[in-house]
Amino acid sequence: HSEGTFSSDYSKYLDSRRAKDFVQWLMST
């Protein structure tokens, strides 16, 4: 169960990182 919670938290973390990277990329172009 803790593994499932970890993976969902991790995917949320990856999504937020990807969103930040995307915004940075939009700003830089």
Curated annotation (Swiss-Prot):
Spell out the PROSITE patterns in the cross-references: GLUCAGON (PS00260)
| GO cellular component assignments | extracellular space
The stated induction of this gene product is: Produced in the A cells of the islets of Langerhans in response to a drop in blood sugar concentration.
Question: A single GO molecular function, which one?
Answer: hormone activity
Keyword annotations from UniProtKB, A to Z: Hormone, Secreted
Could you tell me which Pfam families the record lists for this protein? Hormone_2 (PF00123)
Please state where this protein is localized.
Answer: Secreted
Asked if the Swiss-Prot or TrEMBL record annotates the protein with the keyword Secreted, the reply is yes
- A GO biological process this protein is involved in? positive regulation of insulin secretion involved in cellular response to glucose stimulus
Q: Does the keyword Ribonucleoprotein apply?
A: no
* InterPro entries in the record: Glucagon, Glucagon_GIP_secretin_VIP
State the family named in the UniProt similarity comment for this chain: Belongs to the glucagon family.
As for what it does, the entry says: Glucagon plays a key role in glucose metabolism and homeostasis. Regulates blood glucose by increasing gluconeogenesis and decreasing glycolysis.
List the protein's name. Glucagon
